[in-house]
């Protein structure tokens, strides 16, 4: 995924930013493609670098539970972040970047220990809070050029992923 993000940003830079139009456009039917595309698109290399570092670090921590786990968390967080942004962000705005996924990874790591009742996972969650806590709270503050909606719904998606993917989950009787 990271290679795709970087490859697309190189193409986007050469093309004068023309790929950014495929981001999330709230409540516009054409903007729904951005739900999947937005995490791969960035507003320049600075934006991409800012997302790449936590994406890789937290993604690797999640991947300790296997490739399928990181793919499942990524899918859930991407959908919740993207659809939430599409539903509530202001009209005539464009939302791009992987920060919704980054926020989702963080809250997944923070909350999974509680759902799994696992001391090691709780410790990992505490480390995430200590390292990224200020950025998480700051990213929820409305600010021009920042998709706080993507951050908020990404964070919600991380908690949803931790709940849905918890260990020992038994199916409900039919």
What is each PLM-predicted segment?
Residues 1-174:
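A detector for small-residue-rich transmembrane helices and their helix-helix packing motifs
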């Amino acid at each position: 995924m990271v290679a795709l993000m970087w490859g697309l940003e190189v193409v986007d830079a050469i093309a004068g930013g023309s790929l950014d139009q495929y981001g999330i456009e709230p409540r516009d039917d054409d903007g729904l493609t951005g739900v999947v595309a937005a995490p791969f698109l960035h507003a320049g290399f600075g934006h991409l670098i800012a997302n790449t570092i936590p994406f890789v670090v937290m993604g690797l921590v999640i991947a300790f539970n296997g490739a399928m786990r990181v793919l499942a968390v990524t899918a859930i967080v991407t959908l919740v972040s993207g659809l939430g942004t599409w539903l509530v962000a202001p009209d005539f705005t464009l939302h791009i970047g992987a920060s919704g996924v980054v926020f989702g990874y963080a809250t997944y790591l923070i909350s999974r220990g509680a759902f799994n009742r696992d001391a090691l996972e709780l410790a990992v969650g505490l480390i995430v809070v200590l390292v990224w806590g200020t950025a998480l709270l700051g990213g929820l503050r409305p600010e021009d050029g920042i998709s706080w909606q993507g951050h908020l719904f990404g964070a919600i998606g991380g908690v949803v992923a931790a709940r849905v993917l918890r260990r020992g989950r038994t199916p409900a009787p039919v």
